[in-house]
Amino acid sequence: MSLGVCSSPWAGIAFSNGPRWHTLRTLTMGALKDMGLGTRNIEERIVEEAAALCNELGQNQAPFNPRQLLCNAVSNVICAVVFGQRYSYEDPDFKTLLDLLNDNFKLISSQWGQMYNMFPSVMDWVPGPHQRIFHNFELLRAFIYDHIWKHQKSRKSGEPRDFVDCFLDQIEKEKQDPWSHYYMDSLVMTTHNLFFGGTETTSNTLRYGLLILLKYPEVTSGYPSSPGSPRGIRGLSLNLPFPSASPEKVQEEIDRVVGRDRAPRLEDRDHLPYTNAVVHEIQRLVSVLPMGLPRAVTQDTHFRGCFLPKGTHIIPLFVSAYRDSIQFKDPQCFDPTNFLDEKGAFRANKAFMPFATGKRMCLGAGLARMEIFLFLTTILQRFKLTPTEKPEDIDLTPQYTALGNGPPPYELRVLAR
């Protein structure tokens, strides 16, 4: 989103600075923890949603695009934390919310969105699809306002049911303070930040993950692609080199460790090193957020011979670390062994920063890690994935790339295992 919009007085936590940012982040992190973030409660919620997702996936006998179902599942986890409820996948308001989020993510990552970010005063007067960003944004604000109004009607002060109630309690406590950072517009924008940051990025990671597994079935089940099939991924020049003694494949590992009689849990992650490595390598390779959000230096700074005056806007390019051959062998290749040691145990890498780093890293990083792992492992436990074209013909070139990398549209078949 343009800095001209996001730096407005009613901006939420994502683009705030100084004491305002610290105040909003402290409340938001506290409220999210109170609502179960990082606890068994939120894990149970994700496991339940993963089961609901698989039930929906299993109803598709013909090839289908998984985008909507994956967005539904991911967003429902956010809805449970923020609004205290989940939606039916057929709910029209829920569908509208997700369509607006998806449309804005694509628009902001388009050439039109990037042009607006660079020349907002000019692009304000230029007709084009970028103008739809602001219309969508107002519809999203109206959706959130409606939920807040319903909460105000039903809440009990001091007995928060969800994030919105926690924020409303704080607004009530500081209503006499003219300098308070807690007011209705900051609640609306912070809620919008949580939805925007926690829905499209996670669902795009899952969509890209399934697409990669369709292209390389040997990763999933151990069955190789057709003999002599090229390893290159058209458009990105990526390939998949396997060592001669490759680790157990994902479904084999899940079957051995988890079995078929219960759902995967976070406690299984340490016992699924290859699966965990595949999840990390998917995130590294596709780089759903290749750049971090714009930041500003708070004082005059000298960096590698360059002088950055106070207030200079900077944008970290995290994808540069993911393509660094010092950090990752064959960085243009999809290779899960980037996250495995010589004995096949999982190995972390400090250059892996899908949720940014430092004090301003993604608020929902822990939640996103849980969702990506549990959704993917549950899907692979329950289904065999089948592409609608030859694996070697699958193209991983992003549909759009700028703020975010979006996977190209595709269809797949799922067969119960």
How would you describe each model-predicted region?
Residues G36-E48, L57-A80, S88-T96, F119-F143, ...:
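Cytochrome P450
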Residues R304, E342-I372, T397-Q399:
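Cytochrome P450 heme-thiolate "Cys pocket" and heme-binding signature region
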Residues K33-L37, S110, H135-L206, G228-N239, ...:
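Conserved cytochrome P450 catalytic core segment spanning the I/J/K helices
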Residues L139-A142, F242, P247, A263-G305, ...:
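Conserved cytochrome P450 K-helix E-x-x-R motif and the immediately C-terminal K′/meander segment
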Residues S246, A365-L403:
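Cytochrome P450 heme-binding "Cys pocket" and the immediately downstream C-terminal segment
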Residues T201-V219, R234-P243, Q251-E253, G366-Q381:
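Cytochrome P450 catalytic-core helices
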Residues S221, R269, P316-K343:
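Conserved cytochrome P450 K-helix/beta-meander segment immediately N-terminal to the heme-binding cysteine loop
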Residues M1-I42, L70-V77, D93-V122, P398, ...:
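Cytochrome P450 substrate-recognition site 1
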